[in-house]
Regions:
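Active-site catalytic microenvironments in core metabolic enzymes, especially phosphate/sugar-handling
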Residues: 1-228
Length: 228
């Protein structure tokens, strides 16, 4: 890549690499604050998340975190990761879009999301917004962004607590089968907006803040869309 493209001053990875990946569990406390914001008692959110955070930490420990970092060093290409800030941006962006559109049923949630260029592009290659729990005519109830930011998936037990707090629909980037089944048990609808497409929105919102004249070369699943 360094030889072919030339003049690449910086490689930005969205997903964490190096010590950022090794410490991914450190950002998961953010989910406690988010769940409290959506009405889950903070003591319950904290107890459930602390257990999950330890599980994630153990899962990360054997990984080869420095592989990409070492390759960048050998090629003399600066490398940085920007994960949670971008996820925070897309969570806010999608939440504001849905608040404005005020969908009443899940079909309308999908329609609202598909108006966003990154999701529209993802739709063309078969990975657009999808319903993982619930039918198109199901009412949304209270919509929460509990599966967008916070490092990685939280505790599977949290869906019942979200339901108890009045949540009706969860918007996420991705969801494991175990988590999906727990959401289904709690009678919570799950809309999966898409992973790389959601990441692309967050990265695009950040890239749009770069000063004019900075050339951006999209790759590795990044869908570039300029908003200003």
């Amino acid at each position: 890549m360094s030889d072919k493209l030339g003049d690449i001053d910086l490689v930005i990875s969205h997903h964490p690499r190096g010590k950022a990946l090794a410490g991914l569990d450190d950002v998961m406390d953010l989910q406690i604050d988010m769940l409290e914001h959506y009405g889950v008692p903070v003591n319950i959110a904290e107890k459930l998340l602390k257990k999950r955070i330890k599980e994630v930490s153990r899962g990360l420990s054997p990984g080869n975190h420095q592989r990409a970092v070492d390759m960048a060093r050998l090629l003399d290409v600066p490398l940085m990761s920007i994960h949670t800030p971008c996820d925070n941006l897309v969570a806010k962006f999608v939440e504001e879009k849905l608040e404005k559109d005020n969908p009443r049923i899940l079909k309308e949630v999908l329609e609202s999301l598909r108006e966003i260029p990154e999701y529209r592009e993802a739709e063309k290659v078969g990975v657009g917004p999808k319903l993982f729990v619930g039918g198109k005519k199901n009412r949304t109830g209270k919509i929460v962004m509990s599966e967008i930011t916070g490092g990685t998936e939280g505790a599977p037990e949290i869906y019942q607590k979200l339901a108890d707090a009045g949540a009706g629909t969860v918007i996420g980037m991705h969801i494991s089968e175990k988590h999906r089944k727990e959401a289904q048990k709690a009678h919570i609808n799950v809309v999966i907006a898409g992973h790389m497409s959601s990441d692309s929105i967050g990265v695009n919102l950040l890239m749009d803040k770069l000063k004019e004249g900075v050339e951006i070369v999209p790759c590795s699943g990044f869908i570039r869309n300029k908003r200003n």
